[in-house]
Amino acid sequence: MRKLHCALFLILIAAPAVAQTPPSPASGRAEIGAFNRAFDEATRRMDNAASLALWEEDGTSLLPSTKPIVGKKAIAAFLEKVTAQLQGAHMEKFEDMCFDIQVSGNWASEWCVEHQIVQLPAGKPPFDGWGKMLLVLHRGADGKWRLKQEMWNQALPPEP
């Protein structure tokens, strides 16, 4: 009986360490590549639900000339407001390149340069913008990487 208790005790101690083994940096980078593809696709489709699914519940978005947008509900409200203001617009082009992916356990960061062209309704000229993003990602208990924090600012187009 004592051996059984010792064995159960050892299993209980070891189980959390085994269950929460963080990904290796190489596998983490591959998983973040998959996250980036989902992020790109959601942005191209201007799909608020798909974009929101990539956020942590307590995520924070830091955009230029705005107060911090804290929490998934606030981020959803912001996305809905922007979508309403852009009624009839569609993404003509979205591309980005991400660099310097750093993985440490269940946390990661990367920075990206993005370019988007949005066709606006009513004959308005298209929006043609460049930006830089710094992303902090967290890998949840379900194994999915999500945005914990984002900071975005304008960028200059690359020189020809």
Predicted regions and their residues:
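N-terminal secretory signal peptides that target proteins for export/translocation
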Residues: M1-R2
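Bacterial N-terminal signal peptides
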Residues: H5-A15
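Boundary at the C-terminal end of the N-terminal hydrophobic targeting segment
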Residues: A17-A19
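A solvent-exposed, acidic/Ser-Thr-rich amphipathic alpha-helical stretch
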Residues: A26-G33, N48-N106, V113, P125-G129
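Short helix-adjacent coil turns
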Residues: F39, M46-D47
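A short, structured loop/turn motif at beta-sheet edges
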Residues: I101-S109, K124, L137-W145
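Beta-strand elements of well-folded, non-transmembrane domains
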Residues: Q116-L120
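Short beta-strand edge/turn micro-motifs at domain boundaries
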Residues: W130-P158
